[in-house]
């Protein structure tokens, strides 16, 4: 076998269908757009959510609620993720970010109680769940709200 004899596997490369190139091609004249009408024109077609003039669903349904501008979103960390650190480590939001456990700090870090903690750690975070607090102190570690 030589380089010039190489060919792609049968059926692995499909020829692009060129429309509007003669009637015998099967996609000539109207190019697969049917006869006249909005969808046959260039740039034709209806906008997203358009229902033919009927009041669309998003306008029939009443508005509800609002977005609270004062809401705080915390980066969540579970107890089993803290096992990545050595015994006696001081775990802070900066350390968590460097370790790749937290991507963005947001309004701070909240420690949740999912999983089991096996290390004795000093954890500094904005918030702790009650179960996380209990688990950290039970292992001889300490918590500090920052």
Swiss-Prot record:
The record's InterPro entries line, in alphabetical order, gives: Ribosomal_uL15 (IPR030878), Ribosomal_uL15/eL18 (IPR021131), Ribosomal_uL15/eL18_sf (IPR036227), Ribosomal_uL15_bac-type (IPR005749), Ribosomal_uL15_CS (IPR001196)
State the Gene Ontology terms under molecular function. rRNA binding; structural constituent of ribosome
- BP GO annotations: translation
Cross-referenced Pfam families, in alphabetical order?
A: Ribosomal_L27A
Biased composition (Basic residues) is annotated at: 10-19
Provide this UniProt record's keywords sorted from A to Z. Answer: Ribonucleoprotein, Ribosomal protein, RNA-binding, rRNA-binding
Q: Name one GO cellular component term.
A: cytosolic large ribosomal subunit
Region annotation Disordered: where it falls in the sequence: 1-51
UniProt feature, compositional bias: Gly residues: 23-35, 42-51
Q: Which domain of life is it from?
A: Bacteria
UniProt lists the family membership as follows: Belongs to the universal ribosomal protein uL15 family.
On subunit structure and binding partners, the annotation says:
Part of the 50S ribosomal subunit.
Biological role stated in the UniProt entry = Binds to the 23S rRNA.
What's the name of the protein?
Answer: Large ribosomal subunit protein uL15
Which organism does this sequence originate in?
Streptococcus equi subsp. zooepidemicus (strain MGCS10565)
């Amino acid at each position: 076998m030589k380089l010039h004899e190489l060919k792609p596997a049968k059926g692995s490369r499909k020829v692009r269908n060129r429309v509007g190139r003669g009637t015998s091609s099967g996609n000539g004249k109207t190019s697969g757009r049917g006869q006249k009408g909005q969808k046959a024109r260039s740039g034709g077609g209806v906008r997203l959510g358009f229902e033919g003039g009927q009041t669309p669903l998003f306008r029939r349904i009443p508005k509800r609620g609002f977005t609270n501008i004062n809401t705080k979103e915390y980066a969540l960390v579970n107890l089993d993720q803290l096992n990545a650190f050595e015994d006696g480590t001081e775990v802070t939001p900066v350390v968590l970010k460097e370790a790749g456990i937290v991507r963005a700090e947001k309004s701070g870090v909240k420690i949740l109680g999912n999983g089991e903690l096996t290390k004795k750690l000093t954890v500094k975070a904005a918030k702790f769940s009650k179960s996380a607090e209990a688990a950290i102190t039970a292992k001889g570690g300490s918590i500090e709200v920052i």
